[in-house]
């Protein structure tokens, strides 16, 4: 057995070593939130920078399996302690909260460990890699009375909330029967590993990176572009559709599909990836509407957006603006531009406010579970090549 495999088995067997004891401290209105960052890669460092815009926050700890990522984050968080094992970071009693920005296959395990350690959690979407992980995270959050925000920042986006209030809540669209979503040409899923990673760096713990995933020898592409491999995430469906279906859920007040269908494959980029480069997902909801997702890594349509289609018109929205198109061939549209800043800052500030007030955040853990669950159903339909029937009450896939 390879030495790395032995190390990995030992690591996995000890993952449950954390106790459920709460290390949380009571924060006063003027106390600085002490934050630990787990996974300070490219996205993690950006979200960390949004946290650091709050003067009442200090990044007290950094953790990553690759010390180069820690070194880059340390340039901003100069006083932070550093770790390569998240469990050691969670032993810090002074920590109030953690930001989890690891690859998707680690989200659930680290989130549960953090919640059981008494930390509030901001975790990047998707919350889970499997449907089964969702209820476990929700349970850990509720039992430990923690705040858990999932990084679906549209929930805090001002123009999304305005569009909902003006056109959805007022009923101006009439009966909504279709929510169309699409995301074309996302280059992040086409990243190529740099030559510097051809051989595994000595300061990168590959066994720890794999964690709950089946052992395989070092593969720079699977490390660098893990989104292209279904062992580590759900491809474009969980990475991109989770954002859009969450907006649909927010608009419609309906979060649990009753059925899912999908079709797609690896049609253009035959580079060893297991996640489809092109996929279409169709979800059916109990309140008589469907939601679709169309994704391809080829250029296709410019950008990504959502279109809510009703009997009285349609609402088109993306991260830069929304457009109201009343029914009628000659009816002029209403176009409203969004404010020129990243919604992640609003989402982070909502989380930090809830850390102080103990209220539930805009993208609470249950909301995150439901949106990830909808995406997972799409992937299951794709992988099993069949229509999935889902019981919205019991949240279970029905037998054939």
Regions from the PLM with identified roles:
Residues 81-85:
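Conserved SAM-binding strand-loop segment of SAM-dependent methyltransferases
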Residues 14-77, 154-157, 248:
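N-terminal Rossmann-like dinucleotide-binding module
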Residues 1-16:
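N-terminal secretory signal peptides and thylakoid transit peptides that target proteins
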Residues 103, 108-156, 171, 385:
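Beta-strand-loop-alpha-helix segment that lines the small-molecule cofactor/substrate pocket
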Residues 146, 161-162, 172-184, 189-227, ...:
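Contiguous beta-strand/loop segments that form the cofactor/metal-binding neighborhood of enzyme cores
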